[in-house]
Regions:
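Glycine-enriched, solvent-exposed interface loops adjoining structured elements
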Residues: 1-223
Length: 223
């Protein structure tokens, strides 16, 4: 389902026309993102690595070799994304990207660490062969390996669940440029749509101080 279809469902339940100046579609869009994130956090609080494919987005991000990150200096051994990644949904047990791949779809086995641990990664001889991944406070992703085996990469594919799918979409690996962002498939399970519509509708009804009988009930056959 597209976000535009979800927006129209909300407007229909509120008996508001899309050109009504009291309510912008952008506000409805933002609330849809917020409620989607809330439901995903609740539903997958204990199984952050078992997200359904429908809610994921794979982004293609350029990377570059840098000499320093968070006080860690080791020329040519730190690969960083050229931009800060879009904000991901924070779920317990999922402390970083769900998957990082090369452009040929080969998965890069990564050990996720806190950015504060970067200066000490290769001190242990038993773990220094691992490839590490860290995300800094600005959202940049860093890949580090002692043998510098990733130095020739120019871009990577990062799969995650993003708070604002519309923002993340501009970096997606496969995107239909002929579609407006709201006319593309929205990354949400079909089973979650009705709940999101209901939550957004209730929030907006309170905000707009609509009388109870002005809001279509889901049981009226149109929800």
């Amino acid at each position: 389902m597209t976000k535009r279809e979800i927006i129209y469902q909300v407007l229909e339940k509120l008996n508001i026309h899309s050109d009504d100046s009291k309510l912008s579609e952008e506000l409805v869009s933002s609330l849809i993102d917020t409620k989607r994130a809330l439901l995903l956090k609740q539903q997958y609080a204990t199984k952050g690595w078992h997200m359904p494919s429908e809610v994921k987005q794979e982004l293609s991000i350029a990377v570059e070799l840098i000499d320093r990150v968070a006080g860690y200096a080791d020329a040519g051994k730190v690969l960083a994304t050229s931009i800060s990644l879009p904000e991901s949904i924070k779920i317990k047990g999922k402390e970083g990207p769900l998957l990082v791949r090369k452009t040929d779809n080969t998965e890069i086995p990564l050990t996720l660490v806190a950015i504060e641990r970067v200066p000490y990664l290769f001190e242990n001889k038993y773990t220094q062969h691992l490839t590490y991944c860290a995300v800094d406070h600005d959202g940049k992703l860093y890949l580090m390996s002692k043998d510098n085996k990733l130095r020739f990469l120019k871009s990577i594919r990062v799969t995650d669940i993003y708070e604002q799918p519309d923002v993340a979409r501009q970096y997606e690996s496969s995107i239909d440029l002929s579609l407006e962002v709201w006319d593309d498939n929205y990354p949400m399970e079909a089973s979650m749509v009705d709940t999101v519509v209901e939550l957004v509708t209730k929030d907006l009804a309170r905000t707009l101080s609509l009388p109870a009988d002005n809001v279509n009930d889901a049981s009226d056959g149109r929800g």
